[in-house]
């Protein structure tokens, strides 16, 4: 099944000022994360950023900071353990439901998340990305953007991708996400997105 912009949310994990310089192919990863954020903004895909211990690792890099609301600050390696699931559910679930206001909560039909596809980019792939994805997979369809994630070493990054694939996460690339969001060359944002990748 193709990734739909109307059912997607983009999560940028820990792309922080003091962490990025130590990352394998960090500049390329940042460029792809920025492409995702720019396309997400064009297509009205909600963007969430996380920050791991910002007092020590710095804040989200300036290139990405303006694309999302306040970052989810965390100490757990898995953002799913520090409020990300609730945040994504709040963003993707409409406030209205078909339940009568007087109906007891235990009888009410749960509201479905209208944005269950989570697109993940960030660092480090074998720590915070991996643990966050594992924590999200029970509730969401998770797509890990392999050319927008990294670790300090290539070996750790690749081991994370092997494990994530074995666990059932969808491994994609930046261009796969962008072109699936577009579907065809007649999309109103096709030329703008095409400029992002040339």
Residue ranges and their predicted role:
Residues 8-15:
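N-terminal nucleotide-binding beta1-loop-alpha1 segment
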Residues 5-8, 23-54:
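A short alpha/beta connector and helix-capping loop motif
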Residues 17-22:
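Short acidic, Gly/Ser-rich segments with clustered Asp/Glu that frequently serve as metal-coordination loops
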Residues 15, 49-52, 146:
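A cross-domain feature marking catalytic cores of carbohydrate-active enzymes
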Residues 2-6, 57-198:
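Active-site-adjacent betaalpha module
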């Amino acid at each position: 099944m193709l990734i739909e912009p109307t059912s997607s949310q983009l999560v940028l994990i820990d792309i922080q000022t003091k962490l990025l310089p130590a990352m394998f192919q960090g500049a390329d990863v940042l460029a792809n994360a920025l492409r995702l954020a720019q396309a997400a903004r064009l297509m009205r895909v909600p963007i969430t950023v996380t920050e791991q211990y910002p007092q020590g690792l710095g804040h989200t890099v300036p290139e990405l900071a303006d694309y999302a609301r306040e970052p989810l600050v965390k100490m757990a390696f898995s953002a799913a353990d520090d409020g990300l699931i609730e945040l994504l559910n709040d963003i993707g679930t409409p406030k209205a439901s078909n339940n009568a206001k007087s109906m007891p909560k235990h009888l009410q039909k749960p509201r479905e998340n209208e944005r269950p596809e989570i697109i993940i980019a960030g660092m480090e792939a074998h720590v915070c990305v991996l643990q966050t994805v594992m924590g999200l997979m029970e509730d969401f369809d998770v797509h890990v953007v392999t050319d927008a994630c990294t670790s300090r070493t290539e070996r750790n990054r690749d081991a994370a991708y092997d494990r994530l694939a074995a666990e059932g996460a969808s491994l994609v690339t930046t261009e796969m996400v962008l072109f699936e969001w577009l579907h065809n060359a007649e999309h109103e944002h096709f030329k703008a997105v095409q400029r992002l990748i040339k």
